[in-house]
């Protein structure tokens, strides 16, 4: 029997008939009535005997609760009433069947970095995946099996030690699967494509608790949907994806700090470098941030920009000389093994980008080239808002440019990911300690930035990478403007999740 790790919640206010019926009359949850207000103790007594011994069930009074329920984005966060921390993949199917029998909503969580405001509609049971961190390299050395709780830094470190790499997200602290189900951008994508492009097989628990192996030979319709809209269809307990022998053993990085007077020249040179989707594959990642740095100025944001090159400084220099010539305020550089690149480029597992507990109002946009006028408008608005609301000084405007060579080689119709002609990923993140009086200010700020970006490319429709989207954007902006895309997704939703169990992450219906 699983450990019953707290006795919180004896006295939830439920009808007397239900109190009499549970848990004694429902030892395994087989009740016909709605019991969505089950306490952690009741869930432990009923579900505990059905799942593996190493799994655990706990509520808010348990010492593990804070870690299990902490969110990167505290604004509009899901509400959890009980956590089930699974130790085996097979537990997930049992949990979902139990939850369904008791009309208890469930939500799978790995690292807690989801951004959509639709998550605020959730209240119920958390399926905590963070113990499922197994990685098995297949004997042919061409793929590996990853459990659903793996995360980027762990994957980079583990594969590197064995002489391999694969596409991961750029932030070391973020789970692999969350980004993968929406596409999955990162430093290796110019070489190998998105995370989702490299997935060979998914082991999925569907809405009714049944399991399915999803690949290009099994449930092929669902395989298409899971690669770009996967949050809408199931819980992935493990997945197999392609891995690649390490070819580059040392990466060169260079980080610059620019002042605002260099803004227009900077974006002119960035447009030359990224060449409307032709950024050299070895110039794997360049991205920047508008942010406050009080050691430089108390009133004007700095423009911080980093370049990650898969090779030596001498090879990279031809691309960096134009930026050196802008006379940056400062710069730092060096060569490191690939797993250390996140740390030196500001996205490591212990960097501030991974901090949890703040309100974060977000608003993305997808671009092909930078519009310098829009970039100036966004910069000036940043300074005005921080001056008017000093509590928002931790905010950032993030602008990402990865090589897209391998991404563009994949047929756009081959998966639900619709944005292979977005070459630059924009994101405003307004960050502050929980304070509801600032919410509308923050929403107005990100909305205005989205307007600037989108008006700066008048021949294109607005797009929003689904993993960066807040949910205020249109479904077409997230899932594609071709009518057949949403039509196909909705038909598959009706087939695989007719009751809408998976409807909390930018839902398609």
UniProtKB/Swiss-Prot annotation:
Its cofactor is FAD. Residues 1-21 form the signal peptide. It catalyses: (2S,9S)-annullatin H + 2 A = (2S,9S)-annullatin D + 2 AH2. One of its GO terms (molecular function) is oxidoreductase activity. InterPro entries: BBE, FAD-bd_PCMH, FAD-bd_PCMH-like_sf, FAD-bd_PCMH_sub1, FAD-bd_PCMH_sub2, FAD-linked_Oxidoreductase, Oxid_FAD_bind_N. Pathway: Secondary metabolite biosynthesis. Cytochrome P450 monooxygenase; part of the gene cluster that mediates the biosynthesis of annullatin D, an alkylated aromatic polyketide with a fused dihydrobenzofuran lactone ring system that exhibits potent agonistic activities toward the cannabinoid receptors. Within the pathway, anuG is responsible for the five-member lactone ring formation in (2S, 9S)-annullatin D via oxidative lactonization between the two hydroxyl groups. This is FAD-linked oxidoreductase anuG. The gene is anuG.
